[in-house]
From Swiss-Prot:
Keywords: Cytoplasm, GTP-binding, Magnesium, Metal-binding, Molybdenum cofactor biosynthesis, Nucleotide-binding, Transferase. SUPFAM superfamilies: Nucleotide-diphospho-sugar transferases. It comes from Shewanella frigidimarina (strain NCIMB 400). Its cofactor is Mg(2+). The gene is mobA. It is found in: Cytoplasm. This is Molybdenum cofactor guanylyltransferase.
Length: 196
């Protein structure tokens, strides 16, 4: 029987480099940026969750479960991840950011294969050159470790990774899949690229 896999889209940040605009709701070629991410994930997972710390009513319009970080104060992606891990009943949780509209359509399958083959706790995507720290598949039992890490005042996701067995899956065959949008200029460049 195939494992159940849920996904959480992280849209809980403050988006300082986007002028404070909620990145998931920023228009990209006629759709909110998060819609591009949802479209890439909808056939890859059983259920989609959205982590948003503001504008929750707007995120709810897509019909998915929306939740804020359990710990207030914009503590970074780990805070959204640990809350999602505590909510899911799935065998695995896929984590992606809301500002990555070109995710691979085989993301989940390849991360799962890497995790299982290497008997790892989590699998992280790489663009062939750099690891993508917030594009990963992990087991829900890691919630306790992640919560303890946050409770100790830690925030750096790669430091938390080092406590666990990590598989890295290269997507060098799709080098632009993890292009993310942090500034209005990057948004315009990607909008032009998508329109071609």
């Amino acid at each position: 029987m195939a494992p159940q896999i849920d996904a959480v889209i992280l849209a809980g940040g403050m988006a300082r480099r986007m002028g404070g605009n909620d990145k998931g709701l920023v228009d990209l070629n006629g759709q909110a940026m998060i819609c591009h991410t949802i479209n890439k994930l909808s056939t890859q997972v059983d259920q989609i969750l959205i982590n948003a710390n503001r504008n929750q009513a707007q995120y709810e319009q897509w019909g998915y479960t929306v939740f804020s970080d359990q710990d207030s104060g914009y503590l970074g992606p780990l805070a959204g991840m640990v809350t999602a891990l505590k909510q899911t009943q799935a065998d695995y949780l896929l984590v992606v950011p809301c500002d990555c509209p070109m995710l691979p359509t085989d993301l989940t399958a390849r991360l799962l294969a890497a995790l299982e083959q290497q008997q790892a706790d989590l699998a992280v995507a790489s663009d062939g050159e750099y690891e993508q720290p917030v594009v990963l598949l992990l087991k829900p039992h890691l919630a306790a470790s992640m919560q303890a890490f946050l409770d100790a005042g830690e925030r750096k996701i790669d430091f938390w990774y080092r406590q666990h067995k990590v598989a890295v899956e290269s997507f060098a065959d799709q080098p632009n899949a993890f292009v993310n949008i942090n500034t209005p200029e990057q948004k315009q460049q990607l909008a032009t690229q998508i329109a071609k």
